[in-house]
Amino acid sequence: IKESERWQASSGEAPHLAVLFSPSLRAATRAALLVSLTALLGWWAVNAFVPLLGSLLAGDVARAEGLAPEAAQRLAEAWKSNASNAFNLGGLIGALAAIPLAKRWGRRPTFIAYFLWSAAAILLTFGLPLPPQTRLAMLFVVGLGVYGVFSALVFYLPELFPTRVRGLASGFCYNIGRVIAAFGPFAVGAIAAGAGGSSTVITQTVVWVAAVPLLAALLAPRWIVETRGRSLPE
């Protein structure tokens, strides 16, 4: 496959990471880090607990209804699957909506909308004393924002940087969040061990995740670079 003329013209010595923090690219790097870190941290912090939460919510129902151990186990397996499906379905719809919204509203307003939706959905889903069935269904609403925002990264990050550093910049900004999220399995294990079979510990933990997209929404008007209608940087 022939490389594009633009890429060939910009190829040569590989750029150093420091170039991302040069005066000409500093604002773009800051915007990319903000949206990437917010999306990755918000998604991981919720998604990591979704199957466990489904199982523990089922346990709450089983105890309330006095189900036999075999029936309780079947219910837990079904709710684990339903919790993941609800979250992922919301993410799919949210991802499909991001592109037309970004075209209509612009990139910055779209990110702000997704971040505010995510914060509100997390607060409502994990902060209110909801019945287990309602809390399970609300994972769909959480997925719309927390998971759906990822599709906006696909077109936004390349729009920020010139060809010669586009791959370096996108990879660096996106993978910073992945490095931080690598500590996630240890946190999940520790919190699950202290849950004691109740969903309360999980909900009281995850509700604090709302601070991540809320802070990003407050920073977005100054930090997120609007790229709608702009040509890709050379």
Where are these regions (language model features)?
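Flexible cytoplasmic inter-helical loops of multi-pass small-molecule transporters
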Residues: 1-18, 230-234
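Extracytoplasmic gate region of multi-pass secondary transporters
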Residues: 26-92, 181-185
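Interfacial helix-cap and linker-helix signal at transmembrane-aqueous boundaries
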Residues: 54-55, 101-102, 188-197
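Helix-to-loop junctions at the C-terminal end of transmembrane segments
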Residues: 94-106
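Cytoplasmic membrane-interface "Motif A"-like loop-to-helix N-cap segments
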Residues: 104-115
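Multi-pass alpha-helical transporter architecture, strongest
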Residues: 128, 210-234
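A membrane-interface helix-boundary motif in multi-pass transporters
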Residues: 193-211
